Amino acid sequence: MGLIAFILDGICKHCSTQSTWVLVGIGLLSILAVSVIINVLQQLLFKNPHEPPVVFHWFPFIGSTISYGIDPYKFFFDCRAKYGDIFTFILLGKKTTVYLGTKGNDFILNGKLRDVCAEEVYSPLTTPVFGRHVVYDCPNAKLMEQKKFVKYGLTSDALRSYVPLITDEVESFVKNSPAFQGHKGVFDVCKTIAEITIYTASRSLQGKEVRSKFDSTFAELYHNLDMGFAPINFMLPWAPLPHNRKRDAAQRKLTETYMEIIKARRQAGSKKDSEDMVWNLMSCVYKNGTPVPDEEIAHMMIALLMAGQHSSSSTASWIVLRLATRPDIMEELYQEQIRVLGSDLPPLTYDNLQKLDLHAKVIKETLRLHAPIHSIIRAVKNPMAVDGTSYVIPTSHNVLSSPGVTARSEEHFPNPLEWNPHRWDENIAASAEDDEKVDYGYGLVSKGTNSPYLPFGAGRHRCIGEQFAYLQLGTITAVLVRLFRFRNLPGVDGIPDTDYSSLFSKPLGRSFVEFEKRESATKA
């Protein structure tokens, strides 16, 4: 006791000579050190054999957030090598159990509604952007009805009508954009493709009134609303930050604008003159007999605009960047159009797009390596036993599926990190479709349980815009191939890294590519 008293007396005398700020700093460092020690001891001494292994980490709350956020795929593969397909890591204080491989995809993406919940995870982030009472801000049964409305609105007639509209938008953009005025030049890929995809989507899906506004008011509103997906909003979506105030103002203004469009159409007698989604939703009725309210139509249109734009813009940018590294593939695409469609290159149609096999493979291969969403997370609502193991995932965890891991795995795709559209010439990989289909309330869809290739997800939350995405990407790619040759800048090798900081992954930073107009484009 005398020794302890002597030590404490010495500490007190030393502290009495220090400033308050120094003492506060020492106190905080001491608390941090103690918390780190306790955290490490808990991991080493109190392992639960009935739960997946926890990825070792030094700091509580932070856990593995930083290493995961920098490069999720590297993190997943490193952890898989050490812990196997099932492991848990700390993501911003939340225990998140990852289950990789096709079994993991099935376990999570096809999890029963009573066991897993997407709304609890994504609603805080998406509701301020999309608006109330749609997508994740409503009961799952209502969401399934909303997905059915949108899916059934993408009829074959609608899709056929979109091809000439998308073609015209791309050609008009190239003709009028300052970036493409010369025979040769350099352009900012992500910026340019983002404009092309937003114009093509708004012209086709959104309607002519929305498209006309993108040359003025909508562009700024879209940008402000897009800031709602900023990384900090994963934690603080309701914080009174400047970008969130702009987000909220943009959401209100966009909602008002869509409702004005709907009101004007109703006052004009609701005479349908196009195949856009607004007309489709205006005629939809919920199962309880309630017509879809105009505000909900507006919010669904915003959700379509935001979610679809991110995924299409990112994928189309990667296609251009990949083609710039492989001019030989781009020339193959051009020759395919001449061979299949004719040397006069007739206007693109829905039917002749289906004949462009290599074009489809370029899109498929790009989605394999660059799926816009790398992680799909669900909250656990009931304890979930993992077949073949002793693990039971408790309700205090989230679960995470990463279909991109199987798409990058050697066991399914030889030389998985090589971008090679011709790998799809042979049936070396399982089809994206699955024999077993299920109706979650919006029509039969493949469960996708056995496929290593799921760029559009699987289960009840599978993307309903898959057909439109392939159509939009296919048309944009085909038009660009007709007009240009792309190549990397001198001294540039390969493609840029990936930015994983937002909900949707995309090329990191600004990426520039050389273009050269084809003779046919110059004459036109």
Curated annotation (Swiss-Prot):
Q: How is its activity regulated?
A: The activity is completely inhibited by miconazole and reduced by voriconazole (6% substrate conversion), posaconazole (10%), itraconazole (16%), (R)-N-(1-(2,4-dichlorophenyl)-2-(1H-imidazol-1-yl)ethyl)-4-(5-phenyl-1,3,4-oxadiazol-2-yl)benzamide (VNI) (20%), and (R)-N-(1-(3,4'-difluorobiphenyl-4-yl)-2-(1H-imidazol-1-yl)ethyl)-4-(5-phenyl-1,3,4-oxadiazol-2-yl)benzamide (VFV) (31%). The weakest inhibitory effect is observed with fluconazole. Activity is also inhibited by ketoconazole, as well as by the azole-based drug candidates VT-1161 and VT-1598.
Name of this chain's protein: Sterol 14-alpha demethylase cyp51B
List the disulfide bonds in this chain: none
Described function: Sterol 14alpha-demethylase, encoded by cyp51A and cyp51B, that plays a critical role in the third module of ergosterol biosynthesis pathway, being ergosterol the major sterol component in fungal membranes that participates in a variety of functions. The third module or late pathway involves the ergosterol synthesis itself through consecutive reactions that mainly occur in the endoplasmic reticulum (ER) membrane. In filamentous fungi, during the initial step of this module, lanosterol (lanosta-8,24-dien-3beta-ol) can be metabolized to eburicol.
Which residues make up the binding site for heme? 463
Regions that span the bilayer:
21-41
Cite the source lineage.
Eukaryota, Fungi, Dikarya, Ascomycota, Pezizomycotina
Deletion phenotype, per the entry, is:
Leads to the accumulation of erburicol.
Q: What else is known?
A: In Aspergillus, the biosynthesis pathway of the sterol precursors leading to the prevalent sterol ergosterol differs from yeast. The ring system of lanosterol in S.cerevisiae is firstly demethylised in three enzymatic steps leading to the intermediate zymosterol and secondly a methyl group is added to zymosterol by the sterol 24-C-methyltransferase to form fecosterol. In Aspergillus, lanosterol is firstly transmethylated by the sterol 24-C-methyltransferase leading to the intermediate eburicol and secondly demethylated in three steps to form fecosterol.
Q: Which cofactor does it need?
A: heme
Factors inducing expression = Over-expressed in azole-resistant clinical isolates.
Q: Which family does it belong to?
A: Belongs to the cytochrome P450 family.
Pathway field of the UniProt record reads:
Steroid metabolism; ergosterol biosynthesis
| GO process annotations (BP) | ergosterol biosynthetic process; methylation
State the reactions this protein catalyses: a 14alpha-methyl steroid + 3 reduced [NADPH--hemoprotein reductase] + 3 O2 = a Delta(14) steroid + formate + 3 oxidized [NADPH--hemoprotein reductase] + 4 H2O + 4 H(+); a 14alpha-methyl steroid + reduced [NADPH--hemoprotein reductase] + O2 = a 14alpha-hydroxymethyl steroid + oxidized [NADPH--hemoprotein reductase] + H2O + H(+); a 14alpha-hydroxymethyl steroid + reduced [NADPH--hemoprotein reductase] + O2 = a 14alpha-formyl steroid + oxidized [NADPH--hemoprotein reductase] + 2 H2O + H(+); a 14alpha-formyl steroid + reduced [NADPH--hemoprotein reductase] + O2 = a Delta(14) steroid + formate + oxidized [NADPH--hemoprotein reductase] + H2O + 2 H(+)
* Keywords in alphabetical order: Endoplasmic reticulum, Heme, Iron, Lipid biosynthesis, Lipid metabolism, Membrane, Metal-binding, Methyltransferase, Monooxygenase, Oxidoreductase, Steroid biosynthesis, Steroid metabolism, Sterol biosynthesis, Sterol metabolism, Transferase, Transmembrane, Transmembrane helix
Compartments annotated for it: namely: Endoplasmic reticulum membrane
**Pfam families reported for this sequence:** p450 (PF00067)
EC numbers for this chain: 1.14.14.154
**What's its membrane topology?**
Single-pass membrane protein
Q: Is Transmembrane helix among this UniProt entry's keywords?
A: yes
Name a GO CC annotation attached to this entry: endoplasmic reticulum membrane
Q: Which InterPro entries match?
A: CYP450_sterol_14alpha_dmase, Cyt_P450, Cyt_P450_CS, Cyt_P450_E_grp-IV, Cyt_P450_sf
Q: Name one GO molecular function term.
A: methyltransferase activity
